[in-house]
Amino acid sequence: MFTIGLTGGIGSGKSAAAERFAELGVPVIDTDVIAHELTRPGSRALDVIRASFGEAVIAADGSLDRPVLRRRVFVDPAARRQLEAILHPLILHEVKARLASLSGPYAVAVIPLLVETGAYDAPVDRIAVVDCPEELQIARTIARSGLTPDEVGAILAAQAARPARLAVADDVIVNTGSLAALRDQVDALHQRYLTLAANRLP
């Protein structure tokens, strides 16, 4: 299936873009959602994370304490690479399985760390980047998440720089204005992707 890899930094508007694609009837696979599913209590991935990072990253109810783990991996590059080595092969396997089960002209795979991880070797045909200035990313993330400016800064520092994302983009969704403006851009891309999918060689 013709597949779009949708990416962008924290607070860029990936979720809003993905929601619009879904409203247009496009199958959307979100790797963040998959990561949450893979780390449910009792899962093999959570057992490996516990063994690798210790009980400090496990909440009292046995679930993954995501804020604790996030703080750790965003200040420790080695820990971040270790976590990625655990999760990314599992995520890639699940993305491929879900894509294989879909029907329709095209699908969207939301991959926040597409650039940072070399796309997980993800089976994407095109890359769409949701883009905005860093100051907007920071303001939006603080407003929605309650993270401190320092915590947001650490996340941004661990992500690919804006120029690196734009360098790999086939399409750019500029999210510096209203939600309506973002949705209009997604609508235009939807028509383009339908055409590209229809004209794709078997």
From Swiss-Prot:
Pfam families associated with the record: CoaE (PF01121)
GO molecular-function term, one example from the UniProt record: ATP binding
Chief subcellular location: cytoplasm
CDD domains: DPCK
Keywords tagged on the record: ATP-binding, Coenzyme A biosynthesis, Cytoplasm, Kinase, Nucleotide-binding, Transferase
SUPFAM superfamilies: P-loop containing nucleoside triphosphate hydrolases (SSF52540)
Binding site for ATP: G11, S12, G13, K14, S15, A16
Family to which this protein belongs: Belongs to the CoaE family.
HAMAP family: Dephospho_CoA_kinase
Protein name in UniProt: Dephospho-CoA kinase
Native species: Thiobacillus denitrificans (strain ATCC 25259 / T1)
